[in-house]
Amino acid sequence: MKRYKVVLLSGDGIGPEISEISITILKKLSKKYGFNLDIKEEYFGGIAYEKHNDPAPKETLDQCKASDAVLLACVGDVKYDTLPRELRPESGLLKLREALNLFANIRPVKIRKSLLDSSSFKKEVIENVDLIVVRELIGGIYFGQPRGEITQTKIKKAFNTMVYDSNEIERITEVAIKIANQRSKKICSVDKSNVLEVSQLWRDTVSLVASKENDLALSNMYVDNAAMQLVKDPGQFDVILTSNLFGDILSDLAAMITGSIGMLPSASLSNSGPGVFEPVHGSAPDIAGKNIANPIAMALSTSMMLKIGLNEIEAADDIEIAIDNVLSKGYRTSDLDNGNCQVLSCSEIGEKIIQEI
């Protein structure tokens, strides 16, 4: 019987609530499909700072490195915003990405037919949307050096560096090509090459790598136009390839196509070693403990972990089917309420999904 080691980072806010549902799902699937899961929970984010004065303790990172996959819920809380930057929960995410060399972030954006009425977009605009954002994750302006703050007399100055080398761009392009070859063989690379030298290198490198592929359709788009096109006609996109900063922004914009950011999973991957699978949404401390959070993005992230991280394809598909069945029966959490459905709590919608497996 196959055995997998999974590290759970339930984190902060609504994290423990949505994690509990995913763990129950995993336990049921492991029995159904005949594999063993060794699930070890570790401190991460704000809770890790409270316990260890570090949002990403060495023990946690070591356990993640030794695992087959990492399942992460969410981190953060406004109460940590006054801490030094390196102690904030969000800094833990950057440390985790660096420690595991997670250079590729994969965010699928797919509209479920039963949720067409829950989106703020018109039905005819989004009904065929099925795209993937491939975002470079450990380069660009979030990691570039030098960075910092300077005080000159009474004037404060802050600066960051947006930097990529051709190797970083090549490897993320290869990930996008691999995904595109399994889909429509169509990639839209997003940059700002009309004003940024780093974006010109991005465009040149992506074009060079893509030119070696047969039957691959590559287009280029400036990021401001890409944002407009995602709202105007999101169905035109299949695989969007972009840098760290632009991907962060565009993927959240694309999230609203689905009706709620509570519907979007993601995977962060390296060339070797474990990936991290997490919902796109934040920790939502304002609703933590109220049992009203949407656990579906976490469940879909669990599905991605099974499919990509553990190669348990049937088990992964089982989650997707269960979620579609629950939604098609009119069950929703409050963030998806369109006035014509049965609103359930976080635990209730989780139980419905578990029953469908």
Curated annotation (Swiss-Prot):
A single BP term in Gene Ontology: L-leucine biosynthetic process
Reactions the enzyme catalyzes: (2R,3S)-3-isopropylmalate + NAD(+) = 4-methyl-2-oxopentanoate + CO2 + NADH
Gene3D superfamilies assigned to the protein according to its UniProt record, in alphabetical order: Isopropylmalate Dehydrogenase
Location in or out of the cell: Cytoplasm
Pathway note: Amino-acid biosynthesis; L-leucine biosynthesis; L-leucine from 3-methyl-2-oxobutanoate: step 3/4
Primary subcellular site in the record, as a coarse category: cytoplasm
Keywords: Amino-acid biosynthesis, Branched-chain amino acid biosynthesis, Cytoplasm, Leucine biosynthesis, Magnesium, Manganese, Metal-binding, NAD, Oxidoreductase
Entry keyword annotation includes Magnesium: yes
Gene Ontology CC terms, in alphabetical order: cytosol
Complex formation: Homodimer.
NCBIfam families assigned to the protein according to its UniProt record, in alphabetical order: leuB
Name this protein carries in UniProt: 3-isopropylmalate dehydrogenase
Gene: leuB
